[in-house]
Amino acid sequence: MHLVKIACERPDEVGRSLSHWDCTELARHLVADQVVDSISPQTVQRILASHKLKPWRKHLWLSSKVPRDADFVTRVKNICTLYTRKLAPHEMVLCVDEKTSLQPRTRLSPTLPAQPGLPVRVEHEYQRKGALNLFAAFDTRTGKVYAHTAERKRQAEFIEFLEQLDRDIPAYITKVHLVMDNLRMHTGKQVQAWLANHARFKFHHPPVHCSWMNQVEQWFSILQRKRLAIADFADKAALAERLHAFVKEWNDHAHPFNWTKKSVTKIMAKCELPLALAA
């Protein structure tokens, strides 16, 4: 069918200056091409629906056929194995990252709670009171979160967080695997010097564009929905206090995220890459 054929082509390939098709533009194009005398967008939508076509929708992807990270498969396999193999009692896997530029916005009027027939009401106008950075580590075995807040985000602040982890993690844990991206802050000379003097810590870096492999990102999503969606904080100190309070509440009922060999196999199939996990 001509409509389906056109819907499966990019508009610029048929001489149209559009980023994507919608039902109105497809209807207009069919008439201009003299395929039909007239057709409504509603009819176009019904035909597309019968073929499960929605050319106005998009999602981002990375083709495995384009050369990128030469160690892509090795790095992915390393991280997935950490998540799925049985850890020894002396081992721990922590997923580490930063949630940056958190703004303590002070509303000009207090936020009002929900009432019957009314949602939560948030004052539209606010005052910015600077910004704060949250360093967090997610324990893949227990779901416990370690957190540190700082006004700046440099190697110095990251090392402060590493020192906190070193103090908080029991001495019987002799191997701490830290999963994190390879930002300069994570791989700079100061951090490498710290790492050389703390033998129980080992860094693992997923490939570029693989933030989805870092489990703390899932926890950041929960934090955003449950604590930061309504931003109403007097200042940076108040924001830091609320963040640490949320972490404490989370840790009272902490749970890990379920990364199984079966789920990892599905992920790798979508990446078009075979992956043999360790037994």
Identify the meaning behind each predicted range.
Residues A156-V176:
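Short, basic/hydrophobic alpha-helical segments
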